[in-house]
Swiss-Prot record:
PANTHER family with a match to the protein in the record: ATP-DEPENDENT CLP PROTEASE ATP-BINDING SUBUNIT CLPX-LIKE, MITOCHONDRIAL-RELATED, ATP-DEPENDENT PROTEASE ATPASE SUBUNIT HSLU
Keywords in alphabetical order: ATP-binding, Chaperone, Cytoplasm, Nucleotide-binding
Name by which UniProt lists this protein: ATP-dependent protease ATPase subunit HslU
UniProt: ATP binding residues: I18, G60, V61, G62, K63, T64, E65, D266, E331, R403
NCBIfam families on file: hslU, PRK05201.1
Length: 453
């Protein structure tokens, strides 16, 4: 999917996000430029830096969703973080390099799970052999037997043993042994009674004390009595974990993060300022200056190795109600050359959001109630009324964009969702009258709508 053309990327984003053509166009170009960079000769490739983007617009217009869908579309490592969570170096709080370490951690875990899925078949075969070893012990004595149900006859002849093993294998595969109990050893690392070391303050070095001491701590092996079916699952996961090549996983993760990582810096407007804060307030300009080397390209130490940030794509977003992008320090402004303003959503967009996307809100509620055997239907006038109410409440209270639809839909369908398991009438129609009945009293009362919707 990484070689998608800009028009194809926009088309894919249109399936989930309504409107915001300019923002979609900008991120599509940024993504295609990554593919173009990989086709450039080696001597010039490292010189081409990603064109970072600032998405400007009120809450609930699709800023975060555009970045998240973009990452899923391209299978890129993605991490979202609020810029306001960071503090200047020297203050208590998270340092800016932690977002690179977190992105690396997420990518390693994702690749590890994928590799475990790839070796699942082999792991299941190995787990099956271990189960058969438990069911048919080598020794004829009582110590060798691990079955806690009536024992299978232990045979000494190798040919008879092989024949018996194959019979057991067939029974195991047919599920005839699932209810038997076996004793298995489950290994875990011992945890100290008191946590002496804390990771606080060691993030800067990418050091994790638990990982450093992990091999020194004694293994904590517990013997558990479980049914064969559960033992099969436990042992399969155990074998899959042993089959994963962590060196390859780590190397691939570093490569993915460096070449195709995306970091979404939300609320960047909260750290925009002139750095004239006094007293206990942490300098906003200080956080910006800490962000600068990460965005422009530096090497960040992590427990998986050093990660270079030169080609990570940074997408920042903010409402910029009070501050302006020009309030960011000039050096940081220069690292975000593309700025896109997202438009506020109106009634027409709300109607489309409710019905058009692949994950449309109405489709979600229909699918949820179908699990109870209830068929939910929305008339066009009901959808129109819901959109009108969302616009009205946004204008009279706080404008939270499309998120208002979630609160309205939840309140609208509250009674249906509550009584769905018990109702005899399995087809329910939501029309304009139903919407008026459920919501108009709340909408008319501004105090109620402020707290409920």
């Amino acid at each position: 999917m990484s070689d998608l053309k800009p028009m194809e990327i926009v088309r894919e984003l249109d399936r989930y996000i309504i409107g915001q053509k300019n923002a979609k166009k900008s991120v599509a170009i940024a993504l295609r430029n990554r593919w173009r960079r990989r086709q450039v000769p080696d001597d010039l490739r490292d010189e081409i830096a990603p064109k970072n983007i600032i998405l400007i617009g009120p809450t609930g217009v699709g800023k975060t969703e555009i970045a998240r869908r973009l990452a899923r579309l391209t299978d890129s490592p993605f991490y979202k973080v609020e810029a306001s969570k960071f503090t200047e170096v020297g203050y208590v709080g998270r340092d800016v390099e932690s977002m690179i370490r977190d992105l690396m951690e997420l990518t390693v875990n994702t690749l590890k799970v994928r590799q475990q899925e790839e070796v699942q078949e082999k792991a299941a075969a190995m787990a099956e052999e271990r189960i058969l070893d438990l069911l048919l012990p080598e020794s004829g004595g009582p110590e060798g037997a691990t079955l806690t149900e009536p024992h299978l006859e232990v045979v000494s002849s190798s040919s008879s043993k092989s024949s018996t093993r194959e019979k057991l294998r067939k029974m195991l595969n047919n599920g005839k042994l699932d209810s038997r109990f076996v004793d298995i050893d489950v290994t875990g690392k011992a945890s100290p009674m008191i946590e002496i070391f804390s990771n606080t303050g060691m993030e800067e070095m990418g050091i994790n004390m638990k990982d450093m001491l992990g091999n020194l701590l004694p293994k904590n092996t517990k013997r558990r009595k479980v049914k064969v079916a559960e033992a099969m699952k436990i042992l399969t996961q155990d074998e899959a974990a042993h089959l994963v090549d962590m060196e390859k996983v780590t190397a691939d993760a570093v490569e993915m993060v460096e070449q195709s990582g995306i970091i979404f810096l939300d609320e960047i407007d909260k750290i925009a300022g002139k750095g004239n804060s006094q007293g206990p307030e942490v300098s906003k300009e200080g956080v910006q200056r800490d962000l600068l080397p990460i965005v422009e390209g530096s090497s960040v130490p992590t427990k998986y190795g050093t990660v270079k940030t030169d080609h990570i794509l940074f997408i920042a977003s903010g409402a910029f109600h009070i501050a302006k992008p020009s309030d960011l320090i000039p050096e940081l402004q220069g690292r975000f050359p593309i700025r896109v303003e997202l438009t506020s959503l109106g009634k027409d967009e709300f109607v489309r959001i409710l019905t058009e996307p692949k994950n449309a809100l109405i489709l979600q509620y229909i699918a949820l109630l179908r699990t109870e055997g209830v068929e939910l239907e929305f008339t066009e006038d009901a959808i129109d009324k819901i959109a009108s109410i969302a616009v009205d409440v946004n204008e009279r209270t706080e404008n939270i964009g499309a998120r208002r639809l979630h609160t309205i839909m939840e309140k609208l369908l509250e009674e249906i969702l509550f009584h769905a398991p018990d109702v005899e009438e399995k087809k329910m129609v939501v029309d304009a009258d139903f919407v008026d009945k459920q919501l108009m009293e709340i909408v008319k009362d501004e105090d109620l709508s402020r707290y409920i919707l």
